[in-house]
């Protein structure tokens, strides 16, 4: 694992004159290990600290430990409820302990988790709060909240507004020596570019250039992860690639990736988009004349396409299922899904406009 931040933390631990300060830095190091997916290393550190301070807890250290536990939960499974609980606890303790830097960092992570679950109202409040709490040199908090803002604008279809915030994310992450943040930037951009390419292909004329660019971004993200030793959420990268291959019409290449990695990806946090992934898997099977299996996957996609799914995933699922049913000669079902897709894409456009208004207000 290559990380300037890791080397800096190790040096700071060695130089710390105060034992509690050194242990807080060890907990911070565990946070970094969690973000790189090295969970055993992080848990070993935290277990030792918890045992050491069991009889005489320190609130600041407890806050760092809780943040690290939350990050282990988050990077083990995106959207895990335990992550929110642990990081909110760290936020509360750091506030009570009057540790503004840690408080700001926890607030930035809560904004990130709000984004993951698409609670944009809460996210906007956290964005405004973090920007007030974190000074310009608090690179950890500033890089995280800049990434939240960037990906929110990107999600809302306003890449021109996202770009300066992506640049700030890179600037703060580089200043911190934080390769995990730079890896997250590349990965999140790749997923959002893929989502936009998906919408272009399914609801518009289809833009081959956008799909090619999204594939380049996905490959860059995967290569950077390998370079710096990031192991977190490793099943998601091949599923991202499978989607792009399918969008490019390379169904014979996409299908093995789905078959090998889909179940694992669902356990790592992709379950919220199982509706779309099952529908796209069905489409790949249709194209390869696996009609019986395609029908089964289409039924699974319909069952997973609930009202609590993200709007863009619901719209994409209906669009893909319309194609699947049409290819299978089920024209009434195809027409129904086509109509539902049109309504869902319109609702998604409304959501995007609402999100832009929320984040604009948070930044004023």
What residues fall within each predicted segment?
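Solenoidal tandem-repeat scaffolds enriched in leucines and small polar residues
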Residues: 122-220
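Tandem amphipathic alpha-helical repeat scaffolds
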Residues: 24-38, 63-79, 102-119, 141-158, ...
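Eukaryotic tandem repeat interaction scaffolds
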Residues: 210-307
């Amino acid at each position: 694992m290559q990380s300037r931040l890791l080397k800096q933390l190790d040096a700071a631990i060695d130089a710390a004159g105060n034992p509690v300060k050194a242990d807080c830095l060890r907990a911070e190091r565990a946070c970094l290990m969690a973000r790189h997916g090295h969970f055993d290393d992080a848990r070993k550190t935290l277990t030792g600290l918890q045992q050491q301070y069991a009889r005489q807890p320190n609130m600041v250290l407890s806050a760092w430990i809780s943040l690290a536990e939350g990050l282990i939960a988050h990077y083990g499974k995106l959207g895990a409820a335990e992550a929110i609980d642990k990081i909110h606890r760290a936020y509360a303790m750091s506030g009570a302990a009057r540790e503004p830097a840690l408080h700001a960092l926890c607030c930035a992570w809560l904004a990130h988790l709000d984004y993951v679950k698409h609670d944009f109202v809460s996210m906007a409040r956290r964005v405004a709060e973090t920007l007030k709490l974190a000074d310009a040199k608090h690179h950890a908090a500033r890089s995280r909240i800049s990434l939240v803002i960037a990906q929110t604008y990107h999600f809302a279809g306003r890449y021109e507004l996202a770009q300066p915030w992506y640049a700030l994310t890179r600037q703060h992450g580089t200043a911190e020596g934080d390769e995990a943040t730079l890896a997250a930037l590349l990965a999140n951009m790749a997923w959002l570019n893929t989502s936009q390419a998906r919408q272009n292909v399914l609801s518009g004329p289809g833009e081959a250039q956008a799909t090619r660019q999204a594939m380049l971004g996905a490959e860059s993200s995967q290569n950077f992860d390998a370079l710096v030793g990031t192991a977190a959420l490793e099943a998601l990268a091949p599923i991202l690639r499978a989607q792009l291959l399918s969008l490019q019409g390379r169904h014979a290449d996409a299908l093995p990736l789905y078959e090998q990695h889909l179940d694992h990806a669902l356990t790592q946090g992709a379950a919220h988009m199982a509706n779309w992934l099952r529908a796209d898997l069905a489409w790949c099977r249709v194209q390869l004349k696996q009609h019986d299996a395609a029908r089964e996957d289409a039924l699974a996609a319909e069952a997973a396409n609930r009202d609590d799914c993200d709007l863009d995933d619901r719209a994409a699922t209906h669009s893909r299922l319309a194609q699947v049913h049409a290819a299978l000669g089920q024209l009434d079902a195809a027409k129904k899904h086509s109509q539902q897709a049109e309504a869902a894409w319109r609702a998604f456009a409304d959501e995007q406009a609402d999100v832009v208004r929320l984040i604009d207000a948070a930044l004023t």
